[in-house]
Swiss-Prot record:
Region spans: ACP-binding: 256-260
Name of the coding gene: fabH
Organism from which the protein derives: Helicobacter hepaticus (strain ATCC 51449 / 3B1)
Protein name as it appears in the record: Beta-ketoacyl-[acyl-carrier-protein] synthase III
Pfam family, one: ACP_syn_III_C
Annotated Gene Ontology cellular component terms: cytoplasm
Length: 332
């Protein structure tokens, strides 16, 4: 029997129903479409309904990913969700709720907290679980209802984010050309205040000022500088480790945080425009969901084929960051 590799078998996403354009923000904020587009590359984003929770978004993406993998919910051994906007503050995990909604019971389910790097962290965990023989089929989901943690009076943050979910089934293969080749993850708490919610949760009777501490806060300029330098270094490292040249990568799929960061990293690494996948103009920054949502766009546009090599990278609150080299092991 040959070596067992972890393999990305399917990809799916869920986009919430409410589309919010930059023009919509002009009605309530001192901002405009030109200002937002120039600084971020974002034109629209989608927000969940008030009645929808993060687990609802995760469920929709997860259900489709399972179907596309050609398996049943009962075949899933573990459900892992990455999110910064869970259904409950501390417990139960969004993964537990999502797995129940999917009809997956008496299997492992837990959340991870790595902010915008969450999906890369999910891949690292899933790869280890599969290749160690611990599990055979894992459902990983990046899901966010960032609209629940945004201060809609703060134009520096609320225009940046969107809601959504992306899911993958990770299984096994003997074919290295369908394998998750490698995943690197790292973090440095030195930068913890660059992206944060200073107060985890406002207690009952909290003042308005205390409530605002429950929303996302960001030091944009500082984050930009660290992001470009860190991501370029991270991508170079994983390419060198696996002896892969940039031109051998089918698609470079970065976390969709800011178009200026995406372009700066892509240009520094000499990727062509055809290699770089950009979806931020449609969805905004969907945190842990952004990479699988961008990947799903490729899939649904029939551009993603068996064996295609994807290079992923992300940086998020923590600060956390990571990169991955992933062959697509599914069918399209």
């Amino acid at each position: 029997m040959g070596k067992i590799y972890a393999s990305l078998k399917s990809i799916a996403s869920y986009i919430p129903p409410t589309c919010i354009s930059n023009v919509d923000f002009e009605k309530t904020l001192d901002t405009n479409d030109e200002w937002i587009t120039k600084r971020t590359g974002i034109k629209t984003r989608y927000f969940a309904l008030p009645s929808q929770q993060t687990s609802d978004l995760a469920y929709e993406a997860g259900k489709k990913a399972i179907e596309r993998a050609g398996i049943e919910p009962k075949d899933i051994d573990a459900v892992i969700v990455a999110t910064l906007s869970p259904d409950y503050l501390t417990m139960p995990s969004t993964a537990c709720i999502t797995s129940f909604k999917l009809g997956i019971e008496n299997k492992a389910a837990f959340d991870i907290s790595a902010a915008c790097s969450g999906f890369v962290y999910l891949l690292s965990l899933a790869k280890s679980f599969i290749e160690s023989g611990t599990y055979k089929q894992i459902l990983i989901i990046g899901a966010e209802k960032t609209s629940s943690v945004l201060d809609f009076s703060d134009r520096s943050t609320c225009v940046l984010f969107g809601d959504g979910a992306g899911a993958c089934v990770i299984g096994s293969t003997n074919d290295e050309k369908a394998a998750i080749l490698g995943v690197n993850v790292s973090a440095n708490g030195r930068y913890q205040d660059f992206l944060c919610t200073p107060r985890v949760h406002a207690t009952f009777g909290a003042t308005q000022a205390q409530e605002k501490q429950s929303f996302i806060q960001m030091k944009g300029n500082e984050t930009f500088k660290v992001a470009v330098k860190t991501l370029v270094s991270e991508v170079k490292e994983i390419l060198n480790t696996h002896h892969i040249n940039p031109q051998d990568v089918s698609f470079f799929i970065p976390h969709q945080a800011n178009l200026r960061i995406i372009n700066a990293v892509g240009e520094n690494l000499n990727f062509t425009p055809e290699q770089i996948v950009v979806s931020i103009q449609k969805y905004g920054n969907t945190s842990a969901a952004s990479i699988p949502m961008a990947m799903n766009d490729l899939y649904e546009e029939k551009k993603l084929k068996y064996g295609d090599l994807m290079l992923l990278d992300a940086l998020g609150g923590g600060l956390t960051w990571g990169s991955a080299l992933v062959h697509f092991g599914g069918t399209n």
